[in-house]
Amino acid sequence: MGENMTFNVHLKAVIGALTGLIFGSQLAYGQGPEDRMVYFGETHLHTVLSFDAYIFGNRNGPDEAYRYAKGEAISHPAGFEMKLDRPLDFQAVTDHAIYLGMLPAMHDPKMEASKHPISLELRKAKTPSDRLLGFQKIFALLQPGVEDDLLDMEIVKSTWSNIIESAHKHYEPGKFTTFIAYEYTSGPENQNLHRNVFFRGDKAPEVPFSRMVSSNPEDLWDWMDENRAAGMDSLAIPHNSNGSNGQMFKTETFNGQPFDAAYVTQRIRNEPIVEVTQVKGDSETHPILSPNDEWADFETMPYRIGSWDPSNVQGSYVREAYLNGLMLEKEGIENPFKFGLIGASDTHVGAGAFTEGNYWSKVGVIDANGKLRGSVPLDKPREDGSLYSDNNFQTWSASGLAAIWAEENTREALFDAMRRKETYATTGPRIKLRFFASADYDASMINSPDLSKQAYAKGVTMGSDLMLKDGQVPKFILWAIRDPYSSTLQRLQVVKGWVDASGKAKETVYDVACAGGVGVDLKTNRCPENNATVDLKTCKSSAPTGENELKVMWEDPSYNADEKAFYYVRVLENPTCRWSTWDAIRAGVAPRKDIASTIQERAYSSPIWIN
């Protein structure tokens, strides 16, 4: 074993021991909140049972997906091996409810569906272009008002039953958690309004609610409420607001009506968290919305889902939604946008690609290598002279993961944590992150061996409201530990949003802890540059400073008790190579100049709202 490998193994052992001490140990459900552990997992994944995944060559089913999450190797549709560097703690299979299980049936000569003309065409599809054409023909059947003589609800019902059975088979309480789950795929005019629906327990309705019933998410919530009344609790997680064309977080109902209290209550009850990062880009914010945030232009995917149509920025990003929620409160309307954050992959090959250096993208044989996904030049230019494939796969990301603080690794504990929004998102690395707030914290706590216990006892954690009395000022505790398999930490940041006395929404970003032990410049609220660099010929990183742990107690220097505000944490790693640069290096070509060569992996906490 070489010196670097020895160091890395030692580092992982040290960080593992440190993590156990400061982030709690696995104890029985029902003990104090300070005993909660952070669990990392996948909340958005497709198998052979999703119509698009099947068309794109995926033949991995739920069983294979769960085995992958537990650390086993499975095969990519292009034939190579996919394997995690370490197992996940939990996973949900979220196949599309629409046309659930239909594509395997259409390819089975024993099934009546195989005799349909579209089935015959799909069986002949071999090339990526053939498969995309087949996808378009199926997708055309999914539009409102289109007569569909192919869909067989008995197939949907039996497939759903098999998904539930697989989730039960792979559930190992305390070790590995599965959820009964699926994806609801509303998308009028390619405006993404998709949600993943999770059930708390071991029972679910006979058939999942799909866009074939309604494209209005409010009808989905009604269905969820009905099931909850019948003893089947669930929650929905919206995703890819960045591709919603402003529809996900618009400040009116689906049908254009003003919000009322009943709408807000129902939305929050059914959608407590939002997926902020995944393969189809990042939805935290956008440089148009946050021009003074130097890190806002991160993994920006500018299109509506499945098209080249631009997605309207307003109404499509979570930070703006948080601000709009405060604006609604200012107007006397309840806030429908008090949601927490989570990350996921949205893989369509049954296995999430969470690391830049081992990225296999999303849609099977359609984007299985650098040439297909636009990171490596084609063998010869296209007719228009372009050197790269005619798609927007180069805007996709090696992201993300869900992180949940829970008492134990069970369905009930993880679900309840999602319900209370004690969750955060990462773009892939397993960064451990805590965030607390209180008016009663004192400086001596920060180095206390029972910091977590005191922080919970005296305050609130991510996803919560902090209610203050007159004259009180909030103090915040931020605490991050690096993933030993990833880069070191560069900085801890607080993102603040508020509405001022004139009714104008405002935001700012504070650096609050810096690598190298240096202080924040109080004039700019920024850490000094640590001059971290990446060699684009080898992807070797060089950082004069970088931390395994960053921890700080912080007070807002501009706090105004008359202004409602939200705060959330963003932690940034030192720069590393983006997946597209890794593709180029392995192909022996220069990285593409019109896309980022490096990225800064990050984590986003759920906010704390100050009232």
Locate each region found by the language model.
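C-terminal functional module detector
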Residues: 29-62, 66, 73-117, 121, ...
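Long, charge-dense tracts
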Residues: 198-200
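Bacterial N-terminal signal peptides
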Residues: 12-26
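Bacterial N-terminal signal peptides that target proteins for export
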Residues: 3-15
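Conserved, charged catalytic cores of large soluble enzymes
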Residues: 203, 213-218
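Long, hydrophobic alpha-helical transmembrane bundles and adjoining juxtamembrane helices/loops
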Residues: 208-209
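Aromatic- and acidic-residue-enriched carbohydrate-binding clefts of CAZyme catalytic domains
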Residues: 115-146
